[in-house]
Amino acid sequence: MLFLLYAEDRDLLPVNSDGYDDYALRPKRLEVGDRMGRGDAFSVTASQIWGRIADLSRIVDRGDASIGIPPYNGGLFAPANTPLLDQIRLPDSVLAPVIDKLSFERQGSDRRYINYRDLTVQQLGSIYERLLEHEVVREDGVIAVRPNAFARKNSGSYYTPDELVTLILEKTLEP
């Protein structure tokens, strides 16, 4: 979800296109924030927010020329890489607070919209690296998130600091 928020806030997705509005997360984030601010209840059975996230993930993975999105095919949103997500549907009562916390920073009674545009690639990589240290599992019919010390090792996912990349490039490409 962080990558979708980042892509929208950086205008990497066609957020200014009317055709994209029906699938975008930004309007849903604002709507959820307004409703949370008013103390509205969210359904414990309906999964509209989940549906929006699932639809957008599928569109980004496969592309949809009718709304101006090419297939990205990076594998991040490929259903084969996230089989658990196809087996569940989180209700709005669960996802609304998550969307709200990812979208608004609170300082006392003030709420400030979080714009992911300002994240650097390094910060996004660092967040992703930390997320890789956890795994989502189903335990006795309940979905849980738990630390997994071997998750990054098993997936071969390691973040390489800029300084090391620069050094390797300089030494490798020297005449």
Language-model region placement:
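Preference for the N-terminal adenyl/adenosyl cofactor-binding alpha/beta module
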Residues: 1-175
